[in-house]
From Swiss-Prot:
Belongs to the PAL/histidase family. It catalyses: L-histidine = trans-urocanate + NH4(+). Signal peptide: none annotated. NCBIfam families: hutH, PRK09367.1. Keywords: Cytoplasm, Histidine metabolism, Lyase. Contains an active site 4-methylidene-imidazol-5-one (MIO), which is formed autocatalytically by cyclization and dehydration of residues Ala-Ser-Gly. Pathway: Amino-acid degradation; L-histidine degradation into L-glutamate; N-formimidoyl-L-glutamate from L-histidine: step 1/3. This is Histidine ammonia-lyase. It holds the Pfam family Lyase_aromatic.
Length: 505
């Protein structure tokens, strides 16, 4: 059980919450702050003060005063009118993450909602009632209005949810669980939908997958080094310490650990003086991607614990301030950076695939074919990899350089952070498939070199991979092999555990 405080949530905890289904509870101290802040809102309503988002309309209607008797209707109208999401729904892990992150930000005690609202969010998490939230429709400022409105709908008993493996009306799940829908009061509608929790939840899932995919890339690259009899000297610690990037040093260290007892690697000058960049520069390129991952993790953990709605309430109600914490620019930049960092892992992987299948670049059978000419072997697998990396180049175009005004030009600059976050996740799926192709080719090359000569780590990984796909003894439908390896990597490594040297043993 993870305790939410509004301040301390980490990526490691989100792994447990999103992927292992662990439950959540609220810190009592934080809940007390929520209750105290709510008292301020109720006094504002009772006194008839004019405060944006509490006793006024929204966006361009911020100058319209709402009468006390209409406050509840205002909240309901807000949620319904803003539930304009379109397209396929986010994965359940993302909508679960949205619930968790929305509750966590409210626990900071500056949003002005009742404890009842926080508790309802936590009930949905713990009972695994996950909102159906369409992926498209957010500009990333004022936060993720459309996606979060679909989240808010289910608290009211409207909209759809994923529940017990089915997509059902929210009231079906609420009734079965013995829960009553809530009626939103002053400020609560805006507090639920004004924030960055869709882009951040998708970003967290993307980061978790990206982190493990980067570890996998090192192990698969190590198999390729063996298949091409690569020069191990390029990974010498002195070389990488001389440059000074810790991530580069760490990648080189892991490669050395993986290959420490391999009989397939060579020494400088033994077969050739130096390798091509796609082998020799693995620590430099993969290490740079790790720099991106570290940056992204830092920004996500800040945003996971951020107050991102508007207005915010401070000093016991002395300050009720309209700000712009809902603007998703920090996450938009981070997700665009993640797109580039991950796409590059596929770029260099595709070049290693080319070196494995091109007979002009190695002494292996052409395209790793068992009968070159009669059988094409891995020829078109390289085509598929080339297609995926080219698609990634399009997806990697930064979403954050775009903006379009909305709400009659009141909201005249937006982040497009949710688009960036969605595209990052799509790129990661493509990267995994490219790495799957490299793994299939590297395993085949290892058979020609002699499996018994592989390192202890790569040999173990090879045997696990062969449980997913057989050797290439005849041409067959290779798309099935690629998807089998990709699914295996994702379900057994990429979102379950970090892949380090020991994970392969």
């Amino acid at each position: 059980m993870i305790t939410l405080t509004g301040h301390t949530l980490t990526i490691e905890e989100m792994k447990r919450l999103l992927l292992e289904g662990e439950g959540v509870t609220a810190c009592p101290t934080s809940m007390q702050k929520v209750a105290e802040c709510r008292e301020v809102v109720e006094k504002i309503v009772e006194d008839g003060k004019v405060v944006y988002g509490i006793t006024t309309g929204f966006g361009k209607f911020s100058d319209v005063l709402i009468q006390k008797d209409d406050v509840k209707a205002l909240q309901h109208n807000l949620i319904q009118s803003h539930a304009c999401g379109i397209g396929e729904p986010f994965p359940e892990e993302v909508s679960r993450g949205m619930l968790i992150l929305r509750a966590n930000t409210m626990l900071k005690g500056v949003s002005g909602v009742r404890p009842l609202v926080v508790n309802m969010l936590l009930e949905f998490v713990n009972r695994k009632i996950h909102p159906v939230v369409p992926q498209q429709g957010s500009l990333g400022a004022s936060g993720d209005l459309a996606p979060l409105s679909h989240l808010a709908l289910v608290l009211l008993g409207e909209g759809e949810v994923f529940y017990k493996g089915k997509r059902v009306h929210a009231m079906v799940a609420l009734t079965e669980e013995g829960l009553e829908p809530i009626e939103l009061e002053a400020k609560e509608g805006l507090a639920l939908i004004n924030g960055t929790q869709a882009m951040t939840a998708q970003g967290v899932l993307s980061y978790i997958e990206a982190e493990a995919t980067a570890y996998q890339a090192e192990l698969i690259a190590s198999m390729t080094i063996e298949g091409l009899q690569g020069i191990i000297d390029a990974f010498d610690e002195n070389v990488h310490k001389a440059r000074g990037y810790k991530e580069q040093v760490e990648v080189a260290s892991r490669i050395r650990d993986i290959l420490h007892d391999s009989k397939l690697t060579t020494k400088q000058g033994e077969l050739r003086v130096q390798d091509a960049y796609s082998l020799r520069c693995i620590p430099q390129v993969h290490g740079a991607s790790w720099q991106v991952l570290n940056y992204v993790k830092e920004k996500l953990e800040i945003e996971m614990n951020a107050a991102t709605d508007n207005p915010l309430i401070f000093d016991g109600g002395e300050k009720v301030i309209s700000g712009g914490n809902f603007h998703g620019q920090p996450i938009a930049f981070a997700m665009d950076f993640l797109k580039v960092g991950m796409a590059e892992l596929a770029n260099i992987s595709e070049r290693r695939i080319e070196r494995l299948v091109n007979p002009q670049l190695n002494d292996l059978p052409p395209f790793l074919s068992p009968e070159p000419g009669l059988q094409s072997g891995a020829m078109i697998m390289q085509y598929a990899a080339a297609s995926l990396v080219s698609e990634n180049k399009t997806l990697a175009h930064p979403a954050s350089v775009d903006s379009i005004p909305s709400s009659a030009n009141q909201e005249d600059h937006v982040s497009m952070g949710t688009i960036a976050s969605r595209h990052a996740h799509q790129i990661i799926q493509n990267v995994r498939r490219v790495l799957s192709i490299e793994m299939i080719c590297a395993m085949q090359a290892a058979e020609y070199r002699g499996i018994e000569n592989m390192s202890t780590v790569t040999k173990s990984f090879y045997h696990q991979g062969r449980q997913q796909v057989p050797s290439i003894t005849n041409d067959r439908i290779f798309s099935t092999d690629i998807e089998n390896i990709a699914h295996w990597l994702k379900t057994n490594y990429s979102i379950k555990e970090r892949l380090d040297v020991n994970a392969a043993l």
